[in-house]
Amino acid sequence: MESNNVVLLDFSGSSFGMRLRIALALKGIKYEAKEENLSDKSPLLLEMNPVHKKIPILIHNGKPICESLNILEYIDEVWHEKCPLLPSDPYQRSQARFWANYIDNKIYSTGRRVWSGKGEDQEEAKKEFIEIFKTLEGELGNKTYFGGDNLGFVDVALVPFTSWFYSYETCANFSIEAECRKLVVWQNCMENERVSKSLPHPHKIYDFVLELKHKLGLA
Amino acid sequence: MESNNVVLLDFSGSSFGMRLRIALALKGIKYEAKEENLSDKSPLLLEMNPVHKKIPILIHNGKPICESLNILEYIDEVWHEKCPLLPSDPYQRSQARFWANYIDNKIYSTGRRVWSGKGEDQEEAKKEFIEIFKTLEGELGNKTYFGGDNLGFVDVALVPFTSWFYSYETCANFSIEAECRKLVVWQNCMENERVSKSLPHPHKIYDFVLELKHKLGLA
């Protein structure tokens, strides 16, 4: 039987790392988590991702895979039997990849402007942020999950950002919940045990955001 | 037998569109190409890609797929038999996706600063541009193609940008060839008939760049 040595180089506040903690938990894969200090990255991190020098990195039997959506596809391909994330139909797969990329291209950068911005730029970012989630609600439609009746690739790509909602809302004084009712229903559905356990408490993220704002001279 | 109605909404100067013209040609898929006017986008384009409103878009039996790497994977999955682009091994697949994403995240934006920039920013962009291709040469190593003995996903993702080399070099007065010898050898290998036919003449791209610079008030 093939041995599976799985190591995840990660940082607990990273939404990108959370995706992989969720996927590994859903699929019941045992792994060793190594928390990185992003201000003083380990030699292992720099060796395993010399191009981007970023977490998360999955090391499977000594070989590194980088970039969270790429790792998510890898995990889904290698351990496909339990809780498949991407559908088997090529068109449905293309749609899932499209929306996961949409999340990657929009939420992190706009979210950063929401928690770190000031004045007009922050107000603009809040509007854009709500628009992004309205667009995602449009894609969700009347389904329970983005994946349909079962959670899938897009759900796992998106749900980590909900652990940041409290920080976005507190830093920028607005309510995502009040604007995006459908998203809240979806979020409640996502709170099955294995997903919740892989997400940090929103207050822990907020502490991290305050620390970061302090470091950046924004607080 | 399943009917295949394939339409490509495209713009001839787009490196992202070229990827798909190459893939469709390599796989021998007949399709209708519809050239878009990017200053006056068609109602079909806006209907088929309401989120990003961008070419290229592949419409397969009436259903749209957007984002060039996503479309490339879709084409490879639906028409897998002839000239497979992604390898079958999950680790090799993850590496191909990693490098294709690297190309997407780096070349277009840095290339734009090379052809449109001025002074110090342009000099900086030229340096970064060469560094990007040096990194890609490192990945190519001693292989004929990024895909190994046969051209693959990364080769198709990258080769369209070579049709822009003349424009980059002429606008910014430098030589990519002089700095990146390995890349030139690779580029020559790529010039098999079906790839060449899918790429516009470098002078046509240069005319387009001059027109664009004029429109943007840079010429």
Curated annotation (Swiss-Prot), chains A, B:
Q: What is the lineage of its organism?
A: Eukaryota, Viridiplantae, Streptophyta, Embryophyta, Tracheophyta
What's the protein name? Probable glutathione S-transferase MSR-1
Query: Which enzyme class, named as a word?
Result: transferase
A GO biological process of this protein is: glutathione metabolic process
The record's Gene Ontology cellular component field reads: cytoplasm
* Superkingdom to which the source organism belongs: Eukaryota
On induction, the UniProt comment says: By auxin and cytokinin.
Q: What does this protein do?
A: May play an important role in hormonal and growth regulatory responses.
Q: Which PROSITE patterns match?
A: GST_CTER, GST_NTER
Molecular-function GO term, any one: glutathione transferase activity
List the EC numbers from the record.
Answer: 2.5.1.18
Name its species: Nicotiana plumbaginifolia
Keywords on record:
Auxin signaling pathway, Transferase
Q: Which family does it belong to?
A: Belongs to the GST superfamily. HSP26 family.
Question: Which catalysed reactions does the entry list for this protein?
Answer: RX + glutathione = an S-substituted glutathione + a halide anion + H(+)
Domain GST C-terminal stretches: 89-208
